[in-house]
Amino acid sequence: MSYDLLSERYDELVRFDYDGLFAAIKPSFVPSGAALDLCSGTGTFALKLSEAGFKVTCVDNSPKMLTEAAKKARAARRQLLFLQADVNSLKIYGKYSLITSTCDGFNYVKSEENLKKLFGKIHDALTENGVLAFDVSTLYKAENVLSGQTFFEDTPTYTLFWTARKIEDGKIGTDVSVFKKEGDGYKREDGFFVQYFYRNETYKRLLEQQGFDVKFSDGETYGDLNEKSNRLLVVARKK
């Protein structure tokens, strides 16, 4: 499943701290030139990059997510470029001083080999001293918070059930059912997606192999990372 099913409700459901994340990574870059936002979703973070002074390209695998992002850009009178692509088979054209991915985008990279290739492509696409910044849910969160849990959201226009289950180590499958209000009844839509979780040391090793200097922090507090951190924030600078 792509995120098409959730596109119209994504911002309401996720409630992600984009402001906090932007403030956390802002000291690592100079806001000029081109930025590439991978797995950009509805474009909230991309708009922040645009407002900061970047010329921004948004990449996402969901056409409906990109449609929502384009609506936001028009409303904000911002010119962004939108491209549909899967991060697992991504081709990057051009050069960027900043490449980002927020809110678990890289949790959809399906293998360590794909992750290694992606980091290599990003390194090649960055300008000298360019920065890659991304955040992911940790393996600790997958095993201790997500696995076996059911989440529920009820609003006047829709009801959503979200059940996560462990498929194997480092791999969580999520069943999603959305009941959308239509007249006197509801229309049901179902979906399923898989997320992939890697050890923090794996990200560090693969990034360093591709030529990055790497800094980790907690992706929720933006302080020091610890073994029970639910989110990992990575700022990696091209050597």
What are these regions (language model features)?
Residues 1-41:
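Conserved class I S-adenosyl-L-methionine
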Residues 116-128:
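A short glycine-rich, Lys/Arg-flanked "PGG" loop and its adjoining helix->strand segment in the class I
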Residues 44-89:
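Class I SAM-dependent methyltransferase SAM/SAH-binding core
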Residues 102-104:
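Residues lining the SAM
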